């Protein structure tokens, strides 16, 4: 049933951790509006992000940064046809729990904050450097790999130049 919801005209939310990266990706998608048959939008604030999500029942491509999720506790949207795509998923997308330190300060992981804001969304993480340590695991946060695009494929596609190492 989860796959049916994803195929049911989802709203795509693209999350980055930096404004310059958000602007770059938004610009790339904006140039493809005719191919995508819709115009991407960039959320200006948490309130604007909520308006963009609540103001539609389906479709749409919304760009935002992680920081916009930090400003509130209430869910932004409870729809199940939202797909969250996180770029550079190895940076800052950890912590599904809340922890209390010796002084009683509560620390909430970024992954938990986003999932509280969009509790019924599906999540996809994009990274070139997945992390796997005790308290930071890209696979734990986003699940198994959907696809792996390695350096050999990138060179074959002319997406990157080959890297050569010469021992001295």
Can you name each region flagged by the protein language model?
Residues 1-3, 7-168:
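RecA-like P-loop NTPase motor core of helicase/translocase proteins
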